[in-house]
Amino acid sequence: NTKETQIWIDDKANFIDPQVNVIGVHTHYNYGTKTGTMLKAAGMVGRERVVADNIDLLPDKYILHDGTMTKCPAKVPDYRITADKVVIWPGDKLIAYNAKFWIKNTIIYSRAVYQKSLRDDDKSEFPQIGYSSDDGFYIRQYLEHPLGNNVAAFADLGFYSKSKFKPAYGMIDRERNYDLTMAYGNYQDTDSRWIKKQPEFRFDYRSHRLGSLPVSYTFTGIYGKWTDNVKSSWHQDYILYFTRDPIKLSPSLTLNMGTGYEIVKESYNGSSTGTIRFNTSLHKSWSPKFSTWVGYNYTQDNTTLFTYNSTNVGKEMLYGFTYKFDRMNTVAFYQSYDLQNSRVYENYYTWYRNLHCWQMELQYKAKEKRLQWNISVTRW
């Protein structure tokens, strides 16, 4: 039945929006106000697979009542979240009330209120476990709690068999065009190097187009007290970076380029460094299973007071490949070559193992003789 801009469908109906595709019954929707309801709904909201007793359809958000969420496509998910109510702003954030976090049929923890950013998908609501030669076995968990419309408190908790408890805490304000973050605690980079921020204030201006050009730019500003095992310094870091849209040289060949300028200042020794950066890479897909790539990274001055997040090689040539044996196993190799000193800096060997809705990554750095592996939820 229809009346003006409204529809009522008692039988099964499919609601499709740019970021939503759900099927349910007893659907009522008003095209004028872009509001409606649906019972026994199931489908996709953003990248979340959802099931709900009923769902409210609103112009800027969707509200699930007695809902379940997961990214696992299995009929019986390996992990999921259930909640009395979930409010999802697609591409922005979600807030779940009386949330329970399940692995298979076991509740591993619960939260009265839980928030997750959907802008960056690098933070999982489920624990990550792993091992590294430097820190031993570890378990990490990221948690976030809303304090206002755009403000949240967060805790990034990690326990390591060698390094022990390494927590970090803070607050983040996510606005439309930028993020403001205050962080305090222990942070680790991809080379297992630690720093303590006491505290750090960070401004991230999100990617924006440069006029009508095929170029985007970002800006990051950092000010805070950094401490390692031997020194402390009030650290300042400002970087403006431009990224060219990928250039498709052919259906299987893609060129990427980016450049920027960074200024780093330290109170410890009064240093101030200005550095030009340039990065480019060429990716070739030979088949659905095999691809190769080569890259070049240039940093004008890579001398820094702290090793944390520092650039290891000023003039670096990279080349490598990935090969997918089957849907479960992929291997990768790449080499970092120091052009300035004419030497191999490092060889990286990686094995990716698909564990259904989880992924294991095992990496060995041959020159440093360092091993690390982790298991985390698969990013679908």
Residue ranges and their predicted role:
Residues 181-275, 279, 283:
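Transmembrane beta-strand segments of outer-membrane beta-barrel domains in Gram-negative
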Residues 2, 40, 173, 184, ...:
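Surface-exposed beta-strand edges and flanking loops
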Residues 147-151, 174-179, 208-217, 245-255, ...:
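Short loop/turn motifs that connect adjacent beta-strands in outer-membrane beta-barrel proteins
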Residues 349-359, 363-380:
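Outer-membrane beta-barrel "beta-signal"
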Residues 1-177, 181-195, 202, 227-236, ...:
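Structural signature for solvent-exposed beta-strand/loop edge elements and short helix-capping sites
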Residues 60, 90-91, 176, 208, ...:
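Residue-level marker of positions within ordered structural domains that often coincide
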